[in-house]
Amino acid sequence: MADDSNDTATDVEPDYRFTLANERTFLAWQRTALGLLAAAVALVQLVPELTIPGARQVLGVVLAILAILTSGMGLLRWQQADRAMRRHLPLPRHPTPGYLAVGLCVVGVVALALVVAKAITG
């Protein structure tokens, strides 16, 4: 493991407004993760069975996994941005919004297909 003792000597306290903005962004990621987790629980517990048995559970698990990844990646993003601000480095780009968007689109398309199939078959 690398020794971080020399890295901390170059850290500078950033403007508090940037620190608070970074924290607000982190909290927004956590709210998104909580919303995904609530959607997963609601899907599994409240939605009637769809055309394919077990489809609710699979979609619920996918949403729960997205929630866990969103929460973890939000924390990672917060740490990376904080470190960059303290060292006067450019803010790192992060692929998390793209992953989240693709995951939600896949869940949405599958859910739509299942609902349409249920409506057609009765």
Swiss-Prot record:
Annotated compartments: Cell membrane
A Pfam family it matches: DUF202
Family in the record: To E.coli YidH.
Source species, domain of life: Bacteria
This protein's name: Uncharacterized protein Mb2295
Cysteines paired by S-S bonds: none
The organism of origin for this protein: Mycobacterium bovis (strain ATCC BAA-935 / AF2122/97)
Keywords on record: Cell membrane, Membrane, Transmembrane, Transmembrane helix
One cellular component term from this protein's GO annotations in UniProt: plasma membrane
Transmembrane segments: 33-53, 58-78, 97-117
Bilayer topology: Multi-pass membrane protein
